[in-house]
Amino acid sequence: MLRSTLSNWREYLTPISHTSTFETSGQLTPEEFVKAGDYLVHMFPTWKWNGNDFQNVHHKDFLPNDKQFLVTKKVPCKLRANNYLELDDTETKDVGDGWALQEEHSQDSERKSTNNADDSELPEELEELHIVDDGDDEEYDDQLYDNEFADDDIVDIRPSTLRFYDLYITYSTSYRVPKMYLCGYDNDGTPLSPDQMFEDIAADYRSKTATIEPLPFLKGNNISVSIHPCKHANVMKVLMEKVRSSRSRARKVDPQTTDEDWEDLQSDVDDGLRVDQYLVVFLKFITSVTPGIEHDYTMEGW
């Protein structure tokens, strides 16, 4: 609780910056956060802004009243985090404090998107990228959930394992990046205790990045688990550098490239990852912290 209190004071005291440093720092201004949120809501309609519910919201004056935070509700979570096995046959690149970038080489069964959003605008170089924890998880039975069963059948078979989460994203003034909050419920709608919610956080992150705290943007005592954003900007910088490096290498080996093409190619490198795509990529690496939560924005190839 002390950590949560100190974090709230830091959020309150940190001055707001409206100068964009996205390309160099991986951080966002409030205006860029809104732009990225609009893109997320447009591409994935299960995500929504808080809208006109002004009565129950603590407003920050540097954000529009109807765009204080993003929310998606009743996201299923059928297995606990320890049931997920770290993928084998991969290469990883450490980005500090336990975060690792993973490039997929094995034929694993990825969670598929349940919506029809087109992710073709995302840089091609990121399609094979995963971000995973570097802890040792227990192996789970691959036959536990047969594809022949529908979701309703699963609820009947294993009612005690099914949970739901409301996910919130707001803007962190102290780190100038998005910050994720999770509120969990049992399958009968009973709120989960903090210890129960921690069961759905990957073991390697529970003591590093997860904090129990009330939702700061809603009135009342809504207990949540927040994902500490201290490394988010650094991870985004690594992702952007990956895009630039990949496209730069492609330019060097392309025999069709001429001097006249340089300006267009340089523009492609500079614009490899747009600021409005920030939250889509942000949610990709959040899945390494909450592997059991079945985000419906998880796309094939990630």
Swiss-Prot record:
GO terms for molecular function: Atg8-family ligase activity. Pfam families: Autophagy_act_C. The active site is at 230 (glycyl thioester intermediate). Keywords: Autophagy, Cytoplasm, Protein transport, Transport, Ubl conjugation pathway. Residues 102-125 are annotated as: Disordered. Residues 84-159 are annotated as: Flexible region. Residues 234-277 are annotated as: Handle region. InterPro entries: Atg3/Atg10 (IPR007135). It is found in: Cytoplasm. GO terms for cellular component: cytosol; phagophore assembly site. Its main location: cytoplasm. GO terms for biological process: autophagosome assembly; autophagy of mitochondrion; glycophagy; nucleophagy; protein transport. Residues 102-113 have a biased composition (Basic and acidic residues). Belongs to the ATG3 family. E2 conjugating enzyme required for the cytoplasm to vacuole transport (Cvt) and autophagy. Required for selective autophagic degradation of the nucleus (nucleophagy) as well as for mitophagy which contributes to regulate mitochondrial quantity and quality by eliminating the mitochondria to a basal level to fulfill cellular energy requirements and preventing excess ROS production. Responsible for the E2-like covalent binding of phosphatidylethanolamine to the C-terminal Gly of ATG8. The N-terminal region is involved in phosphatidylethanolamine-binding and is required for ATG8-PE conjugation. Monomer. Interacts with ATG8 through an intermediate thioester bond through the C-terminal Gly of ATG8. Also interacts with the 40 amino acid C-terminal region of the E1-like ATG7 enzyme. Also interacts with the ATG12-ATG5 conjugate. This is Autophagy-related protein 3. It comes from Kluyveromyces lactis (strain ATCC 8585 / CBS 2359 / DSM 70799 / NBRC 1267 / NRRL Y-1140 / WM37).
